[in-house]
Design a protein with these regions (language model features):
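Non-catalytic helical/linker scaffolds that mediate oligomerization, partner binding
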Residues: 1-472
Length: 472
């Protein structure tokens, strides 16, 4: 059973039902809907397709709705592109104007208040670099071109040294969030997170709608890297969004930041997605480059919960082949023993000390006796997250009467969730779920399995029971 999950961005190449079915059957675990593109009608149609396929295949593929965030862009250029010359002076205006080699506009009105002399402005993913000479703090910034080149219309702008004051959620994001919550999407990706406060604000909006969507904090700003300890406490999951991150921080720092964020996620039992350019050459090619194979492999070895595809599956020539290829790499890496057994002793002063201790000892016992699987009953999904964070070699099966977490758990390393709502007795439940797994050939007669539950079984309290037994 594959443990590291695969997230794929959907688009024109992967929206047809039969294409998506093949992706489901070849290892896809989470469908990402990118709100930067497409209409609500298109998104609603693909969400319906995902849910139909879950019914038809018996899988629980999750849906991640990715909010665009406050993307700052240049305005329109004369003849669609202009050349900025090294050493020349260029004016940036917040007033709309046709861009030339000496001036262009930007879509963020408060930028002149935010920037200071000496700070750098990066254009088109860092291909062009400007330095702020002065600002009138109203509508105009004077810059010097440090590294010139061709600047096209509507290109992204990054500010590696500047604290931007614009809100984390734009008006478009709020509309997209309303749609996502209305559609009961499992995970919400929050772009350009700068601090834990951004997560708290989004959670408040989700709670106001009385929804249970979980939050992925996309780490792509230097401020987020600095505040990672507070962010990881507030969020439900993390994404190492290496595209903008690699522009805003020195690119040579990204691999170590990736490893650090994955370790934080494991420490706090929060899933981590590694994203951007993982197999980008497969947008057009039938096989990945060797560097891409190593990139995916290293994310798995680092301990990522999931690896993500973007253009490869949204607009690529063969999205099914991309899923198959990534699935093959992931499974091969999971044969390496070094990715398992990351148990951390539970802290006695934690509110969930008893549950954490049960999970810790289940994983430790599983290693000692070579248990085939750890089976847990959970209403909130907490034990699934906690057990997964300890990276046991045993398979992890979560049984729940809470349908909302069935798909959410599909993002979590090693976890497979099943709907189960019988509560006759603890012994009956343990025997019954072993029988169900045996029927699906996920465990076999003679396998050792570990069961976790709360007693009495009908309560949704802390897990306080651990049982080791054979499958009969």
């Amino acid at each position: 059973m594959k443990k590291t999950k695969i997230v794929a961005t959907l688009g024109p190449a992967s929206s047809p039902k039969e294409t998506l079915r093949e992706m489901f059957l070849n290892g896809l675990n989470v469908c990402r809907i990118n709100f930067s593109h497409g209409s609500y009608e298109e998104h609603a149609a693909v969400i319906q397709t995902i849910r139909e396929l879950n019914e038809e295949t018996g899988l629980n593929v999750a849906i991640l709705g990715d909010l665009q965030g406050p993307k700052i862009r240049t305005g329109v250029m004369n003849n669609d592109s202009v050349e900025l010359i090294d050493g020349s002076e260029v004016i940036i205006s917040t007033k709309e104007l046709l861009g030339t080699e000496v001036s262009f506009s930007i879509n963020y009105a408060d930028l002149p208040k935010d920037v200071e002399a000496g700070e750098h402005i990066l254009l088109d993913d860092g291909k062009l670099v400007l330095e702020v000479v002065s600002t009138n703090s109203i509508d105009t910034i004077t810059t010097k071109v440090l590294h010139g080149g061709i600047l096209s219309s509507k290109k992204g702008v990054n500010f590696p040294n500047t604290k931007i004051s614009m809100p984390c959620l734009t008006e478009k994001d709020l509309n997209d969030l309303d749609f996502a919550l209305e559609m009961d999407i499992d995970w919400i990706g929050l772009s350009f997170v700068r601090s834990a406060r951004d997560i708290i604000e989004l959670r408040h909006l989700i709670s106001k709608k009385m929804k249970s969507a979980k939050i992925i904090a996309k780490i792509e700003k230097p401020e987020a890297v600095m505040d990672i300890d507070e962010i990881v406490k507030e969020t439900d999951g993390l994404m190492v969004a290496r595209g903008d991150l690699g522009v805003e921080v020195p690119y040579q720092n990204v691999p170590l930041i990736q490893k650090a964020i994955i370790n934080k996620g494991i420490q706090h039992a929060k899933p981590v997605i590694v994203a951007t350019q993982m197999m980008e050459s497969m947008i057009t090619n039938i096989s990945p480059t060797r560097a891409e194979v190593n990139d995916v492999a290293n994310a798995v070895l680092d301990g990522a919960d999931a690896v993500m595809l973007s253009g490869e599956t949204s607009v690529g020539k063969n999205p099914v082949q991309v899923i198959k290829t990534m699935d093959t790499i992931v499974k091969e890496m999971e044969s390496f023993d070094g990715i398992y057994e990351k148990e951390e002793l539970p802290e006695r002063n934690q509110a969930r000390f008893i549950t954490d201790s049960i999970c810790f000892n289940a994983c430790r016992l599983g290693t000692r006796v070579n248990a085939k699987a750890i089976l847990t009953m959970s209403f909130s999904g907490y034990t699934g997250y906690k057990i997964a964070s300890m990276r046991p070699n045993s398979d992890i099966f979560v049984f729940t009467s809470n349908r909302k977490i069935l798909t959410q758990l599909s993002l979590v390393w090693g976890v497979r969730a099943y709907y189960y709502d019988k509560t006759v007795s603890t012994d009956h439940t343990i025997a019954d779920i072993k029988f169900l797994l045996k029927k699906q050939e996920l465990v076999n007669e003679g396998d050792l399995v570990i069961n976790i539950a709360s007693m009495p079984i009908e309560s949704h309290g802390n897990s306080n029971m651990l049982k080791l037994s054979y499958v009969e």
